[in-house]
Amino acid sequence: MTEKKSMLDGEKQYHIGLAPGDVADFVILPGDPGRVEFIAGHFDDAKEIAFNREYKTFTGTYKGRPVSVMSTGMGCPSTAIGVEELANIGVKTMVRLGTSGAMQEHTRVGDLVIANGAVRQEGTSTEYMPIEYPAVGSADMVFALEQAAKDKGSTYHIGVVQTKDSFYGQHDPDSMPVSYDLNQKWEAWVRGGVLCSEMEVSALFVVGSYRTVSYTHLTLPTSLA
């Protein structure tokens, strides 16, 4: 596959405020800027590099390896912008770290969910690929997270997650004019074994595939969806 190029490759990026050399090749992507310093607290020599809009970035090292963390904000549009601009400055590996709502009885609050695919119930990724194009995680990254979960003795699940655009449309579908459609799709996802519901992963997977970077997603269900 030919690597895709952007007109802003190699320059300081407009939204994230970062230039080549500001971040490591490996970047952790939470949504909430408020979680960035908590994650960076596990780094050695962590320094704030930039904070523009929803994109807050720290860079440091972890066990001797350079690593960065950058928030993306909530939802697929801002996530896609962040992934695009990180790819523009040479980042090759991205792991989204976030929270979600559990959709299966066996997926409990506090378990780890490693996404190997995502339901594309959002609009951003269709600006990149037709809806028939699968949103799947990088196999090597999924395997690496599985090994890490095993090594830590964590309870984990690997499978498909649902990505949506509307937070309240999901949590209060009966109040929406399209309630029938929302409820029918929700039932289909549950019966199809979808593990949890969130708002960013399919954009990461589709844009990451297009930009030829390695990517995956680790989520912690914090509620029942």
Give names to the regions the model predicted.
Residues 185-214:
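A C-terminal functional module that forms or caps the active site or interfaces directly
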Residues 2-143:
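Metabolite-binding pocket within alpha/beta catalytic cores that recognizes anionic/polar moieties
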